[in-house]
C-alpha cells in the first residue's frame, strides 16, 4: 500500500508494518477512556507541571507541555484541543493505567503493544499507521470497530467486475441510506 523507493528492492509496507511511536495521536483514545471512567468534556483538570521522583531508579519524570505553558485548571475539552500533555497524564492517572490500557483495545490496539506505564498517555506505544487509522475510525463510526479493506473491486481488461468487497457496515442506518440513494432514478 505504501512503500519506499522500489517494491522490487523492498516489499516493506509502511502502512501495515512500520511501527512508530504515535505521540499525541493517542490522546483522543486516552480522553475517550477518561470519559468511559466518568469524566466529561466539562470536567476540570489541573494543567500544572508534574515532577515525579522514582526512588528505586533515582530518576525524576517530568512530562511537559509543548510549548511548556500551563493553564492551571482547564476543562477537558479545551485541554484536548490544546493537546496538553500533563492533562493527558492526569486523565490516565484518574482513570487508571490498567483500565486505560484495556480500554485502548476497543479501538483495535493490541494489548501487547501498550506499555503499562504513564508514558502511554503521551504516545510512547508503537503502532502502524493502519492501526492508528483503524482506531480513529472507531470514533468516526460511532464506536464500531471495523476492519479496513484496501481493494474495493477488481475489474478485467473490459471493465467487467470480477470481484467486489462486501465490507461490514458500521451502522445499519448508513447501509439503508446507501441502498436508497442507489435505488432512486
What are these regions (language model features)?
Residues 33, 37, 82, 90-94, ...:
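Generic, well-ordered alpha-helical scaffold segments in large soluble proteins
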Residues 58-65, 96-134:
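Mid-domain, small-residue-enriched loop/turn segments at the edges of structured enzyme/sensor domains
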Residues 19-46, 79, 135-139:
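Active-site SXXK
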Residues 1-15, 26, 78-82, 126-185:
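A penicillin-recognizing enzyme superfamily signal
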Residues 42, 111-120, 146-152:
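Surface-exposed patches in mature extracellular/periplasmic domains of secreted proteins
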Residues 39-98, 145, 157-185:
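Conserved catalytic neighborhood of penicillin-recognizing serine enzymes
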Residues 18-23, 68-72, 76, 80, ...:
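Secondary-structure capping and boundary motifs in well-ordered enzyme cores
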Residues 3, 7-10, 35, 42, ...:
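Proteins synthesized as precursors that undergo proteolytic processing into mature forms
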Amino acid at each position: 500500500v505504501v512503500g519506499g523507493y522500489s517494491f522490487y528492492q523492498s516489499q516493506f509496507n509502511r502502512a501495515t508494518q512500520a511501527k512508530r511511536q504515535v505521540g499525541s495521536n493517542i490522546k483522543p483514545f486516552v480522553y475517550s477512556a477518561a470519559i468511559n471512567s466518568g469524566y466529561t468534556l466539562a470536567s476540570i483538570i489541573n494543567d500544572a507541571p508534574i515532577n515525579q521522583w522514582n526512588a528505586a531508579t533515582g530518576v525524576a519524570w517530568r512530562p511537559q507541555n509543548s510549548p511548556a505553558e500551563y493553564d492551571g485548571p482547564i476543562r477537558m475539552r479545551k485541554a484536548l484541543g490544546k493537546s496538553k500533555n500533563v492533562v493527558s497524564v492526569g486523565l490516565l492517572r484518574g482513570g487508571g493505567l490498567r483500565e486505560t490500557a484495556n480500554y485502548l483495545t476497543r479501538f483495535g490496539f493490541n494489548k501487547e503493544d501498550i506499555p503499562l506505564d504513564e508514558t502511554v498517555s503521551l504516545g510512547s506505544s508503537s503502532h502502524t499507521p493502519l492501526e492508528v487509522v483503524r482506531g480513529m475510525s472507531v470514533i468516526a463510526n460511532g464506536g464500531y470497530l471495523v476492519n479496513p479493506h484496501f481493494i474495493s473491486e477488481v475489474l478485467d481488461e473490459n471493465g467487467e467486475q470480477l470481484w467486489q468487497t462486501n465490507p461490514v457496515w458500521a451502522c445499519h442506518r448508513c447501509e439503508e441510506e446507501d441502498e436508497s440513494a442507489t435505488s432512486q432514478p
